[in-house]
Amino acid sequence: MKILHVCSELYPLLKTGGLADVLGALPQAQNQIGLDARVLLPAYPAITAGIQNTQVVAEFDNFAGHVVLRYGEYNDVGIYLIDAPHLYGREGNPYHDAYYNDYGDNYKRFALLGWVGAELATGLDNWWRAEVVHAHDWHAGLCAAYLFNKGKPAKSVFTIHNLAYQGQFSYHHLYEIGLPTGMFHVEGLELFGQISYLKSGLFYSDASTAVSPTYAQEITTPEFAYGLQGLLSGLKAQGRLVGILNGVDENIWHPNVDQYIPHHYKLKYMAGKKKNKAELQAYFNLPQDESALAFVMVTRLTEQKGVDLLIESADEIVKQGGQLMILGSGAPHLEQGIRELAAQYPENIAVKIGYDEALSHLMVAGGDVILVPSRFEPCGLTQLYGLQYGTLPLVRKTGGLADTVVDSASESIKARTATGFVFENATPEALRHCLQRAFALWQKPRAWTMVRTDAMEQDFSWRKAAEQYRTLYERL
């Protein structure tokens, strides 16, 4: 079965969020189970720098100007690149300029991405024709509309990585992107008087997926749906909206092969974890105390990630003699709040503002508990890394966090299903109580080791996700 993934980011060449991680791993996993998956991307400078050996597949002029379609390979996956320098030849972020202003021609840049995705299902490449066009997030949302307008020559799937970004543009652009005005309708592209690329993906695709079963349920409610609850709850009722969890790329995130950590370890030989903890404490200039419960947090510093909840309850960690290490950047007032905590409690709390890939790996490997107290989290990857590394996730019960972490209540510990700590209400009090429960378990080393073992035995491989997507494709 020939699958074309249409997207705007690819790890490690270009990444602004978790979308890139998915596209860096899922197509490869699908090829390993016998599918024929390829990826279509705009030829951004960062992408072309990493995929230099390409051949021309097609050359044409359309509503977006002169376009060359190229083909190359990256990590054993076939990659199509849309070479249109007037649209994509911009350094840095793919969506906005250095001042965070969205590019004024984004409507055209991402319409072209969708258009080429549909054309690859109708013979644009003489040697390969997509049978399923799998579009990701709003950037690729018009794929399904172009396919619909062509009489649906291929099956279409649309994956929502984050519903908060919708790709809305003025309706008059419809004349510039080659779609009939009849599609601008509440039963079509229209949302609040504008064209919505995200709604296009949902409305016209044969099936839509969200990146976790709980998030697929949450987005049918007004709180999470951004005005699309009617459409989304309808799709859910028809069985056209399902949740499939993201996986972990075990070539990059596994404690026995991780290239960024000084000491490798695995379930049967855990000595390396203690050594990584000592290295981590030394990096952050905290006391190298093996008995101190070490909490780590690697995140964007935003309210969505629950950082404000942690700021208000972090004194509990200090009171109980624990340590807290934070890596991230984001809202200035939260950066300031974290810095003030570290200044107030220099023996217990340390922070690095910014992002550091190598340090993030050491934190996951060296910590005892990884904090993910998000207000909402479509899937979440850091808690999956925590499970993989035996760093117990402490999470709020939402989205993918609810699907992947089982609370260490006494009955679940006995049943060998517990893998971390879970709290429900997005309040500092609820988080504080959860921190207290983590300290209580830490006082019982045998029980802690048991939960850690069960956490590390969880399977969140991309192979598992690839099989679930194959089942979905076959159902269409």
Swiss-Prot record:
GO terms for cellular component: cytosol. Pfam families: Glyco_transf_5 (PF08323), Glycos_transf_1 (PF00534). Pathway: Glycan biosynthesis; glycogen biosynthesis. It comes from the Bacteria. GO terms for biological process: glycogen biosynthetic process. Keywords: Glycogen biosynthesis, Glycosyltransferase, Transferase. ADP-alpha-D-glucose binds at residue 15. Gene3D superfamilies: Glycogen Phosphorylase B (3.40.50.2000). It catalyses: [(1->4)-alpha-D-glucosyl](n) + ADP-alpha-D-glucose = [(1->4)-alpha-D-glucosyl](n+1) + ADP + H(+). InterPro entries: Glyco_trans_1 (IPR001296), GS/SS (IPR011835), Starch_synth_cat_dom (IPR013534). The keyword Transferase applies. GO terms for molecular function: alpha-1,4-glucan glucosyltransferase (ADP-glucose donor) activity; alpha-1,4-glucan glucosyltransferase (UDP-glucose donor) activity. Synthesizes alpha-1,4-glucan chains using ADP-glucose. This is Glycogen synthase.
